């Protein structure tokens, strides 16, 4: 029987990336070291990494027909990512972002044109055949709709034997109040450093202890804190930590968080422990920071 897939639900966007030797001053005219088009978006990037790691994966997100979508779909296919779940929209434009990557320190500055393209709805998600997937990862966006999607998975899982249940993870990256209802869903919840700092926490460990009461019974909460590494807190109350694995030189951090999330999911889906998954996530994300793009992370 064919191995089940990992489905990532969220954003795909065209990233137009300018690599510069130093961040430009306002109102100046300068050359970049290189420029490339790259498929971006959190869930989309996580699919790229999962595929590079050897997982069978699929992407679900919104696209509008046109040249940009053609490029993005071709790139998904080149990476071996299944795009049969894409929600094609009759209105709106495919989103695009301009990214400045500073080659001297790896910083990335993103200016997103988040267009009028509708997000994937609970109605779109009703068409998904849940029997095809062993894991579904949801990037927090239109949370009220995503709660309905997560409830559908919960209802499905309630009818399945343990080995047939779909495992679920959720990412809460943006400090938007609407997204915080997603803490209560999924067996793995990724909360970003940005959200943790927005809520007044000064370290990953402090954030996990302060936010753990929001997750559902038995879930694990994970927080990556850039060069400080990452922490996880599960139902046993033991705080796990992995140091970061910085490359010899940081050149591109665009998508590092998505790389971490995907690597943790991949490791857990293979039956590894949370400590092993946390370490693996930090290792692969660290390697990515030393490379332009994603090629070469494995």
From Swiss-Prot:
Alphabetical list of InterPro entries matching this protein: Ketohexokinase-related, KHK, PfkB_dom, Ribokinase-like
Regulation: Requires potassium. Inhibition by ADP.
Recorded GO CC terms: cytoplasm; cytosol; nucleus
Reaction it catalyzes: beta-D-fructose + ATP = beta-D-fructose 1-phosphate + ADP + H(+)
Tissue spec: Isoform C is most abundant in liver, kidney, gut, spleen and pancreas. Low levels of isoform A found in adrenal, spleen and brain.
Keyword Transferase (UniProt): yes
Pfam families, alphabetized: PfkB
Signal peptide: none
Residue sites binding ATP per the record: 108, 226-229, 255-258
Pathway: Carbohydrate metabolism; fructose metabolism
Residues noted as binding beta-D-fructose in the record, renumbered to the chain: 15, 41-42, 45, 258
Coiled coil location: none
Keyword Kinase listed: yes
Keywords: ATP-binding, Carbohydrate metabolism, Kinase, Nucleotide-binding, Transferase
EC number, UniProt record: 2.7.1.3
GO biological process per UniProt: carbohydrate catabolic process; fructose catabolic process; fructose catabolic process to hydroxyacetone phosphate and glyceraldehyde-3-phosphate; fructose metabolic process; regulation of glycogen metabolic process; response to fructose; response to glucose; response to insulin
Top-level enzyme category: transferase
GO MF annotations, alphabetized: ATP binding; fructose binding; identical protein binding; ketohexokinase activity; protein homodimerization activity
Mod. after translation: The N-terminus is blocked.
Its job: Catalyzes the phosphorylation of the ketose sugar fructose to fructose-1-phosphate.
Subunit structure and binding partners: Homodimer.
Homology family: Belongs to the carbohydrate kinase PfkB family.
Protein name: Ketohexokinase
Organism: Rattus norvegicus (Rat)
């Amino acid at each position: 029987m064919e191995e089940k897939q990992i489905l990532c639900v969220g954003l795909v966007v065209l990233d137009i990336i300018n690599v510069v030797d130093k961040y430009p001053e306002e109102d100046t005219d300068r050359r970049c070291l290189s420029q490339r088009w790259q498929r971006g978006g959190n869930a989309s990037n996580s699919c790229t990494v999962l595929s590079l790691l050897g997982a069978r994966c699929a992407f679900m997100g919104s696209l509008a027909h046109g040249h940009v979508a053609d490029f993005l779909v071709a790139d998904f296919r080149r990476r071996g990512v299944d795009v049969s779940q894409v929600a094609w929209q009759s209105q709106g434009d495919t989103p695009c972002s301009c990214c400045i990557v500073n080659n001297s320190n790896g910083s990335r500055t993103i200016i997103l044109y988040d267009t009028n393209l509708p997000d994937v709805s609970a109605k779109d998600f009703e068409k998904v055949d849940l029997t095809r997937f062993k894991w579904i990862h949801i990037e927090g966006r239109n949370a009220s709709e995503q709660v309905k999607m997560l409830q559908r998975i919960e209802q499905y899982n309630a009818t399945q034997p343990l080995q047939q249940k779909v495992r679920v993870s959720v990412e809460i990256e943006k400090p938007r109040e609407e997204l915080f209802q997603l803490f209560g869903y999924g067996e793995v919840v990724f909360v970003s450093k940005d959200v943790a700092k927005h809520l007044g926490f000064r370290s990953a460990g402090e954030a996990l202890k302060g936010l753990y009461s929001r997750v559902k019974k038995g879930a694990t909460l994970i927080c990556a804190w850039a060069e400080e590494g990452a922490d996880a807190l599960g139902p046993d109350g033991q705080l796990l930590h992995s140091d970061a694995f910085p490359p010899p030189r940081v050149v591109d951090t665009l998508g590092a968080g998505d790389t971490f999330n995907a690597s943790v999911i991949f490791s857990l889906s293979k039956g590894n422990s949370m400590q092993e998954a946390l370490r693996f996530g930090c290792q692969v994300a660290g390697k990515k920071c030393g490379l332009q793009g994603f090629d070469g992370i494995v």
